[in-house]
A protein has these predicted regions:
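Alpha-helical interface subdomain recognition
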Residues: 1-88, 100-105, 112-117, 130-133, ...
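Short Ser/Thr-interspersed hydrophobic loop/turn segments at strand-loop and sheet-helix junctions
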Residues: 53, 76-80, 101, 169-171, ...
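Short beta-turn/strand-loop junction motif enriched in small, turn-promoting residues
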Residues: 62-64, 126-129, 145, 153-155, ...
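Helix-loop "lid/cap" segments that line or gate small-molecule binding pockets
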Residues: 93-101
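A short, Trp-centered hydrophobic/proline-enriched beta-strand micro-motif
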Residues: 116-124, 168
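Flexible, small-/acidic-enriched active-site or ligand-binding loops
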Residues: 135, 192-223
Length: 386
């Protein structure tokens, strides 16, 4: 990454890079073929991450986290992003949404996540409500001091089966100048709670060892004490997490793109055809030039967004531009890398084919490329009254 960093940030990047090389990369092919990370492997990664201070680095020191700023977290995510989410999930972070916990909830949910005793999941996507969050069908009906939840969530991603879910459900309707609008609230629901079931989702061609789950709620009764924040605050709570999630996706895409570029450069310098390295052919060398240029541009967008977040100035448009460009950039670089490697680029002996498959998901989750373009264009046109 050819970007000016402080000495502390450079040390962080080097430290995470070593962790990835020594602890994660050697397991990559094994977990890809197994379709999941074993409990033993996951515990070893998590314990090493805790020892090195990476785990929960995004949360404040006041709750036992690392207290890193967003720029440092982007640097960290960029390095961790070079490997499968299935592996780096064990070394990363609980969601910042848990900072909305009250004192009782902190001891039950937040603090165990900080120490690695528990793992949460974020459940907002539904079979009929992906990008259109407000069309969610999951409902929570008030019943005295309880809420009764009915509905389902899918594409709930996690490196392991979660201990509890942060579930978003409609709890009523508000009248707004634009008409009725669903009031969305968040609930903390434990695995095994009556009326709540977690099952494995279908296997995905991308991020094969990164698990996805289906969450089903059938008259699931939870108390007021299980609500995260206040009623109707669900989308407000989720907004910051979603925005920063797009920056983390962008950072991870840059990490994988750098890995693809390095592999392609090495291959182009050593693979010979017609008595010369294929990197000497213009078709290959121009691909490499484009790859390096696009990666640099994406890196700058990611760091720009992260630094604005540190200053409290990041907008939804900043996050959307970051996620859009970086994910589309990774798609192009992955395709170039396969082409440069030829037939070997599609063989499991090399990581190229996995990185190529994994790249496809980045343009879909955390908001599709089309949604990002909608956010960006809306910010451009609305000031003009369009």
């Amino acid at each position: 990454m050819d970007i000016e960093l402080s000495s502390e940030q450079r040390m962080l990047a080097d430290s995470v890079q070593s962790f990835v090389s020594e602890e994660l990369l050697p397991l990559e092919l094994e977990v890809e073929r197994a379709g999941e990370v074993s409990a033993e492997q996951g515990d070893r990664i998590k314990n090493k991450a805790i020892e090195m201070g990476f785990y929960a680095a995004n949360l404040p020191e006041s709750v036992g986290g690392g207290g890193l700023d967003y720029t440092s977290l982007a640097i960290m995510e960029r390095e961790l992003g070079k490997v499968s989410h299935a592996l780096h999930g064990f070394a990363w972070r609980p969601t910042e949404l848990l900072m909305a916990c009250n004192d009782e909830q902190k001891s039950r949910y937040l603090l165990p996540c900080v120490t690695g005793e528990k793992v949460e999941c974020f459940a907002i996507t539904e079979p009929g409500a992906g990008s259109d969050i407000m069309s969610m069908a999951t409902r929570a009906k008030s019943d005295g001091s309880d809420w009764i939840i009915n509905g389902s969530k899918h594409f709930v991603s996690s490196h392991v089966e979660p201990d509890f879910a942060i579930v978003f459900a409609a709890t009523g309707t508000d009248d707004t100048p634009r008409g009725p609008r669903k009031r969305v609230s968040a609930f903390l629901v434990d695995r095994g709670h009556p009326g709540f079931e977690i099952t494995r989702g279908p296997r995905c061609v991308s991020q094969r060892a990164y698990l996805n789950f289906v969450l089903s709620f059938n008259d699931c009764r939870v108390s007021d004490a299980q609500m995260l924040g206040e009623e109707g605050e669900g989308l407000m709570l989720a907004d910051k997490w979603i925005k920063m999630g797009r920056v983390w996706v962008g950072a991870g895409c840059c990490g994988r793109a750098e890995r693809l570029l390095e592999l392609s450069l090495e291959w182009a310098a050593n693979r010979k055809q017609f008595d010369q390295p294929i990197g000497k052919f213009q078709g290959t060398s121009f691909k490499l030039a484009d790859m390096a240029t696009e990666l640099q541009a994406a890196d700058l967008l990611v760091m720009h967004a992260a630094r604005k977040a540190d200053a409290g100035e990041m907008t939804p448009t900043d996050a959307a531009m970051c996620k859009l460009f970086a994910s589309e950039m990774l798609h192009r670089l992955a395709d170039h890398a396969v082409q440069i490697h030829g037939g070997m680029g599609l063989m499991e002996d090399l990581p190229i084919e996995r990185l190529w498959r994994d790249a496809r998901l980045e343009r879909i989750w955390e908001g599709t490329s089309e949604i990002q373009r909608h956010i960006i264009s809306r910010s451009l046109l609305r000031p003009l009254g369009a």
